[in-house]
Amino acid sequence: MVQTTEAKQVCRAASTVLFPELEFGVKPCGKYTREDFSEILSRIAFDQEFANTGGKTLQLDRDEHVDITATARNSLAKSLLYHLRNLSTDAITDQFDGVRDRVFEVLRSQRRLPAFVDVAIDLHEWRFYGSADTDHVLTTYPDLGTNKAFCFATLCIVAPRTRFTLAVVPMDANGFRAKRDAVRSLLETAKQYVSIRHVYLDRGFFQVHVVAELEQQDVEYIVRARPSSGMKDRLSVGAETVADEYTMQRKRKPTAAVDVTVFAVPHRTSEDEHVWFVTSLDVDSSTARAYAAAFRRRWGIETSYRQLGEFLPRTSSPTFSVRLFYFLFAVSLYNLWVLANVLASAETVPETPLISTRIFRRFVLSTDYG
């Protein structure tokens, strides 16, 4: 059981990791302050709202005069977006790197980091309804009325209640080169903070150059596979599992080849179907099910993505710096919510979060943004 006072303390302590790191390039003579921008960002993140609405509600709560029927953009929201549009990518990523550093300083000081962690790499698509020619917008599968999206590769810890997002890489393309480079960057960043035991990747990363990069990074991995006919031929009629040596290769330039173990287990819900993987681990038919079960833990990341979405502001902006800032701000708030629950849980990790996102919102919104 967590008392109100204790919950408030850990939530506000977590928030002090974030807000002092935020910089917007505000001039001393500006109409609005860094604290104003931090507060409106928090509101639109927790409420999943547009900046214009968030600016109006914030000023109404301050008893300031606001024309709620005005069609022109709210002045506070307009100023926030102006400053975000003028931030460089490096200026944005540097400050959120600082937030991550402080999160892990707290975890180390509290001795809450395990000796080794499993991690999952995945793609997070933020759907876009504007022009396909917009910078950083990729064409992807149709969903929610569009086939365009801003895309971010993420690396997360795979463990109940401690699913921190360790690294984020914006994607400028969706080919194998971009994915290979993203995997390299994510792993190199993650290794600065944790010791990696296994890396799990979904079928979107089942490409020989990506697997070759995993080998180069010297990490143990399991990748969900799209089975070729050569793979399927290894499964005997009536067999439930299979594990065998296999060579992934690309014969067209740029060529690549990687020796892996391929294994398959029965699909959990579809009869006569199997789920296929490639791995660097020593897997045989007797251990294939156990490794497939270990891979299923990465599916908990889907829950993390939904919870991350609870901190993502709404926007129709085509400007990449706005999207990047919003996404990294959401990741930071999500990580701080996880951190608050870690700090509130003493020595044990509960099955469900002690502090809900709604309670976290209430305590953070009442904090000092200085």
Ranges and model annotations:
Residues 1-32, 41-48, 53-72, 172, ...:
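A short, flexible helix-boundary coil/loop motif
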Residues 140-194, 275:
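Electropositive, glycine- and tryptophan-enriched low-complexity nucleic-acid-binding patches
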Residues 66-89:
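Major-groove recognition helix of helix-turn-helix-like DNA-binding domains
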Residues 81-157:
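Active-site-proximal, Lys/Arg-enriched surface segment
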Residues 176-232:
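Domain-level cores of phosphate- or acyl-group-handling catalytic modules
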Residues 217-307:
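An anionic, glycine-rich sequence signature occurring as long contiguous blocks
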